[in-house]
């Protein structure tokens, strides 16, 4: 199965640290950005801090990346977003469609991309609003020593085969995506690697499968999946056998 690796411009945006959950989660300009790290312990993160003199402050971190899908032809039948984890695994994660990087990968990631999520709704859960690109991983099921698999949705597969660029935001699921304020003073985070890591051994990538084409029926009782050629002709080049 072929792989698509994230562009080196990937990175993470941290919200401003403010006195309300809504102010952090729905930050429209972001507080800071990092596109040069090879790894971050706050690949996805939500935090609640105790403030001096009483009260609390909040912070949210989201990661963004994009993939060049212009070379894909045919139907994408399966896709898995693979993120190399590390350090922390007490958070949660989901991949959603994003309009960061100018919407086409032609613009550098900026703090204003913090809420560049398709279907983003200020003050509301993203459930039913965002275009989900993966399943969710929650709690300690996140590996800190290997790759984590996020199974791609039909929306991801469709965009991979139809669009030249696929842009992804990876965000905390339990609190950020669902818009549920962090209750206790804590940081809930997953650690993860970016494309700036030397080589590709820990880079984010999408593993995908292109559906087979050509003759797709049984021949003399043998399943098409087990047939490579008929009379020396590759099945990918056959539409009919004896007119069928």
Explain the meaning of each model-derived region.
Residues 64-68, 78-84, 149-157, 167-171, ...:
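Residues within well-ordered beta-strands of beta-sheet-rich folds
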Residues 210-244:
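Intrinsically disordered, compositionally biased repeat/linker segments
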Residues 24-88, 201:
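A short beta-strand-loop element at or near the start of a globular domain
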Residues 54-56, 89-92, 102-105, 173-189, ...:
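Short, surface-exposed beta-strand/loop "edge" segments at domain boundaries and coil↔beta transitions
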Residues 5, 87-164:
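Beta-strand-rich interaction/scaffold domains
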Residues 1-24, 214-222:
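Boundary/junction segments of secreted and surface-exposed precursor proteins
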Residues 2-13, 59, 155-213:
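Proprotein-processing/basic-patch segments
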